[in-house]
Structure formats: C-alpha cells, structure tokens
Amino acid sequence: MIQQESRLKVADNSGAREILTIKVLGGSGRKTANIGDVIVATVKQATPGGVVKAHDVVKAVIVRTKSGVHRADGSYIKFDENAAVIIRDDKTPQGTRIFGPVARELRDKDFMRIVSLAPEVL
C-alpha cells in the first residue's frame, strides 16, 4: 500500500530513479494506492541525460508493492520493493523499457503497453 510521502523506485528508463508520492488519484480523500493505481509524484533522483529531470512532477502507475495483492483464485503475490512506471496522460509509459516483473493486475486496468514491454508478468 502506497500513501502520501511514500518513496518508490522507478522501473523504466525514463531517467528517474526514485519518486516521492504527492497524491493518490481516483476519488475524494483517497489515502492509499495499490498495484495498478495512478499517483502523482515528484522525481527525487534522476540519471543525467534522461527525459525526466529531478524535481519534475509526474504521473506514475504502481507495478510492484511490498504489501502485495490478493487475487480472485485465492493466491497472494508480494514483491521485494515498491516500484512504479512513469506514464503520460494517455496511460502510455514515458520510457521505452520496463525493468523487472510486473503484476498481472495491470492487464485488467488497461495498461497493456506496460504489460507488453515488461520482461515478466506475474
């Protein structure tokens, strides 16, 4: 579960390395976000020469969480880190590559471009 002020690793090659959550989108007074939810964040660390610079305000979708997610078949999946992918307004990723596995729940929430770029979908 991701909330305001949570720091996440960035799982793409957009130029950002770490982001800090400003707001969870999707409802009035919503406090937490899980896999597949969109957040507004600021870039805390960035690589030189990247598309995204430090201190930029961006939108991102969460692809991995330590808290995990329950599935309809009764299974439960957790990851070792909290990670997100920076997206544009039309839900397409800013970068051209995705690093690490992503959850299958992104397919249900219409992030098909992220699912197709990911090396592994769990």
From Swiss-Prot:
GO terms for cellular component: cytosolic large ribosomal subunit. Gene3D superfamilies: Ribosomal protein L14 (2.40.150.20). GO terms for biological process: translation. GO terms for molecular function: large ribosomal subunit rRNA binding; structural constituent of ribosome. InterPro entries: Ribosomal_uL14 (IPR000218), Ribosomal_uL14_bac-type (IPR005745), Ribosomal_uL14_CS (IPR019972), Ribosomal_uL14_sf (IPR036853). Keywords: Ribonucleoprotein, Ribosomal protein, RNA-binding, rRNA-binding. SUPFAM superfamilies: Ribosomal protein L14. Part of the 50S ribosomal subunit. Forms a cluster with proteins L3 and L19. In the 70S ribosome, L14 and L19 interact and together make contacts with the 16S rRNA in bridges B5 and B8. PANTHER family: 50S/60S RIBOSOMAL PROTEIN L14/L23, LARGE RIBOSOMAL SUBUNIT PROTEIN UL14M. Belongs to the universal ribosomal protein uL14 family. Binds to 23S rRNA. Forms part of two intersubunit bridges in the 70S ribosome. This is Large ribosomal subunit protein uL14. It comes from Lactiplantibacillus plantarum (strain ATCC BAA-793 / NCIMB 8826 / WCFS1).
